[in-house]
Structure formats: structure tokens, C-alpha cells
């Protein structure tokens, strides 16, 4: 990992120290490997910081008519709140008007999941995702709606399990009504 390359304490040692600080007995059998598992899990949740974006495969339109919007609704993704490093469960809906060719459906979903795999502030993430999709999908227009359930306010702070945050962004001339549903685990 990056921390090890800089000669800093190994991440597992930092997690172990944090657990001890919280009062946990790090020698207990159920906890002894927790630092290693935690670092691995955090690596998975932030893979978008280290991995390149997925390549997008395009298919020819094969018709002369002007293409209308393509809508993909309720893509499930997980991110982290950049302020607390707690999970944000996301449901993302996107619409785009194809430019030169149509991207493969699975690639659009993979791109959204890759983009979410990092610490985010949802408002900024939604704007960035719209820009990213415009570029990577070679779209003429894009609309994005993100519905997020933030664990930082679900399990701590105000402890409200009924709220969700919805953010929207548009690029170009696209007339669609997106409606994300609350992420599946939170319904």
C-alpha cells in the first residue's frame, strides 16, 4: 500500500493502535486478525483511488434517427463519507444521449461503481460523475441522480435511519426525469 512505500507505520499497526485506544483487547482471538481484515476492506472500498477507470466498449448505433436518452436506473454502489470514513450506500441513476456509438451497459455500471469507490462528499461526487460520464461515454448529454444513505448520520450523530440525500447534475441538453430509489439495504 501507499503508506508502506513512504516508510510510515504499517496500516495494520495503526488499526491495532486505534483498537487499543478504544479499549479493545487486541489479543482476543476474534480481534487478533481484525487490523488485517480492516485494511483489506478499506482497500476494497477505496479501490477507485488506485485502479484506473474501466475501459468502455462502444457499439455502433446502426440507425439514422437521432438517438434519444438511454436511462439506467438504480445502480447500487458503496462509497465512504470523506469526513467520517463511514459507508454511504448509494443508488445512482444515469441518463445519456449517445454520441459516437453506444457504450456497453455493464461498462456504464462498472464506471459508476469505480467512481464511487473512494471517500466522497455526495454533492461534489454527483457533479464529478456527470463530467466523468460525459467524457468516458462520449455522450452528447448526461443527467445523474444520486440517492445516498449516509451511515455518519444513520448510526451516529442524529441517528436518523429514515433520511436519504438526493443530488442531481446535468450536462448538455437532456430532458429526462430520473428517480432513484433508496438504496436496497435501506428500504
UniProtKB/Swiss-Prot annotation:
Keyword Membrane among record annotations: no
Pfam families: GTP_cyclohydroI
Record PROSITE patterns: GTP_CYCLOHYDROL_1_1
Catalytically driven reaction(s): GTP + H2O = 7,8-dihydroneopterin 3'-triphosphate + formate + H(+)
Known EC number: 3.5.4.16
SUPFAM superfamilies in UniProt: Tetrahydrobiopterin biosynthesis enzymes-like (SSF55620)
Record key words, sorted: GTP-binding, Hydrolase, Metal-binding, Nucleotide-binding, One-carbon metabolism, Zinc
UniProt GO molecular function: GTP binding; GTP cyclohydrolase I activity; zinc ion binding
Any single GO CC term annotated in Swiss-Prot or TrEMBL for this entry: cytoplasm
Coiled coil: none
Translocase recorded as keyword: no
Domain of life: Archaea
Binding positions for Zn(2+) per the UniProt entry: 81, 84, 152
Known pathway: Cofactor biosynthesis; 7,8-dihydroneopterin triphosphate biosynthesis; 7,8-dihydroneopterin triphosphate from GTP: step 1/1
Quaternary structure and interacting proteins, as annotated: Homomer.
Family per record: Belongs to the GTP cyclohydrolase I family.
Protein name (database record): GTP cyclohydrolase 1
Species the sequence originates in: Pyrobaculum neutrophilum (strain DSM 2338 / JCM 9278 / NBRC 100436 / V24Sta) (Thermoproteus neutrophilus)
Gene name, Swiss-Prot/TrEMBL: folE
